[in-house]
Amino acid sequence: RICENPGIIQERLAEMICTDRTTAARAVQRLAENDFIERRFDSENQKIKHLYPTKKGLKVYEPIKRENDYSTEVAFQGFSAEERKNAEQLLDKMSVNIAQDWDYVKKGNKRNY
C-alpha cells in the first residue's frame, strides 16, 4: 500500500490493512531495514513520519501488482461486466462492515458473539 499511497503515515497504513499499530510498526521497520521504503519527517510536525517506496521497493512492487491483477482477473473469469460490478460492490460493503468492526475492537471493546 505504500507504493500506491506514497507519503502515507504509519497510522493510516495500519488502518488500511486492518492491523494494530504495533504489527504495522514491526512491518514498516523490516521494510525500512531491507531498503524497500524510507521514512521522511513531516516538515511541520517532526513526530510524524511519511513512508515512501525506494527504488528497490518500486522494483519489487511491479511483479507483485501484476500477480495481484492477474489473480483478480482469474477470480472474475466467466463474470459479466454487471456481475463483476455487483461482486465488487458487495465486497466493498463487506470491507466497510469489517472496518467498522475492527475499529470497534481496536478501541478496546469486545465483540458479542
Question: Language-model features: where?
Answer:
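Short, charged/polar low-complexity linear motifs in solvent-exposed/disordered segments
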Residues: 17, 28, 77-80, 103-106
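Charged, amphipathic alpha-helical coiled-coil/dimerization segments
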Residues: 29-89
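Short alpha-helical linear motifs
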Residues: 22-23, 75, 108-113
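Short, locally clustered residues in the helix-turn-helix/winged-helix DNA-binding domain
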Residues: 1-4, 65, 92
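N-terminal helix-turn-helix DNA-binding core of bacterial DNA-binding proteins
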Residues: 1-23, 30
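C-terminal regulatory/oligomerization modules of transcriptional regulators
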Residues: 81-113
